[in-house]
Every structure is written in C-alpha cells, then in structure tokens.
Amino acid sequence: MKLTIDRSAFLRPLGHVQSVVERRNTIPILANVLLKARNGRVQLTATDMDMDILESVSCNILQEGSLTVPAHILYDIVRKLPEGAEVSLEADGENSRVLVLAGRSKFTLPFLPADEFPAMSDEELPCRFSLGSDDLKALIDKTRFAISNEETRYYLNGIFFHASKTSDVPMLRAVATDGHRLARVEIPLPEGAKEMPNIIIPRKAIAEVRKLIDDWSDDIDVSLSETKICFSIGDIILSTKLIDGTFPDYERVIPSGNDKNMRVS
C-alpha cells in the first residue's frame, strides 16, 4: 500500500475513528485502525467489538492495499504536522512497518495484517428512517445528562428510544434516568419508524454520534434491529450494539393531572 493525502483531509476521519478505539486493549489489533486504499479513496475502520465506525476520504493512491496501524499514534502524528502538509504512507511488507512521511518529518510504525482485523457484522436491520440533524441533536442534548453511570443498573446506561403517542399524534421519544432525575423529549415520529422496536443506545455510542453530527446539517439515515443500530452520516457509518435490557416504566413516575406549569428560558 502506498498513498499520499492532504493532512487536513486525513486528520478529520482519523479523529473520528481513533475516538472509538479504547486506550487499553488486551487484543492488540483492537488498538489499530484498518486502512484500505482502493479506487481513489482510503477507507478507515475502527472497532471496540461493541461499536464500529467506517469513514472514507479521497486520496492519491500509488499502490492499492490494506493494513492496520496503531490508531492513536497515527492520529497524534498527523495532528502535530503543520497545516497544508502532504502526508505519505508507504508499507514495508518485509519488515511489517509503515513509513509516514511529511516534509522533513519521518515516522515508522508497526502494522498488523488487515485479515486479522475483526470482520464487521452483517446483521439485517429491517427498520429504516431518516432524522434531521437538529432533531437528533435535541433528542440527545436534552436527555443525556440524566444517563446513569451506575454499572450495576446497566439498562440505565444509555438513552431509551421508542415510538409513542401524545394526544394521538405519533411521536419518537428519547428518555434517560439515573434513578434520581428523569429527562424525556419527543419529536414527531419519522416516516418508517412506526414499527421500530424499543431500544437503549449505550452512553459511549451516544457520545460518539453527538460528536459526529456537531457540524452536520443534513439528514441522518438510521437503520436498526432489536440488537443493533446504524447511523449513516455522509461518508461516515457508525454502528453499535444496543443494551440488552428492559428500560423501566418511566411514565409511572411522571405525575399526571398537574394544574401548575412553569416555563424556564
């Protein structure tokens, strides 16, 4: 594999994928990012075995190929290079090394074979719909502060999403609670989401999705099953396992028939 790419164009997807990689890994290849260079693009993939992220970006490919390199180290190298630098990556198969060049800077990184990288699951995700980026931001921002950090109650370690009705109007609700406070927010149910199962998206996945959509203004394609959800955000695909548990009946703790209202702005 041999390619050249603009430093800024490479840094953005590297920042996204390295964020998924755990700092400590008992399986060495999980500390790596998979790079696949083909058809004028380099595809970056990372996983922690619960969550996968894939992103591709245009580059100048001199020799197609694929390999895996330490994600955090490569990100730190590219991040510290000067703006406007051209980055060159060249694999040395005999020594299992990757040469990273940029101007006078030269780095050598070890690599592991691409075929040792965990294969992404190909699960059928039958429920599909689109969400506006502002809607998804609101669903996350208005609930995630209430996500529990208590690992023993794992079913509270995420945001509960489900289809419901308010005054007979179909709605998509997001709910989070830590047992002391509860946040619930809803938006009109997107077309195609009527048959969606009740799901709990883990805290880490919520944080990663929120970072990815921070500067995104277009719609986000969502596909899901009872065990997995996938977000397509432009050239980025993030998928995660869902929390296998039952969210408590939160509506029982919300008082009804209140005759007093307060608006805070």
Model-identified regions with their sequence ranges:
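Structural preference for solvent-exposed beta-strand-turn elements
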Residues: 1-265
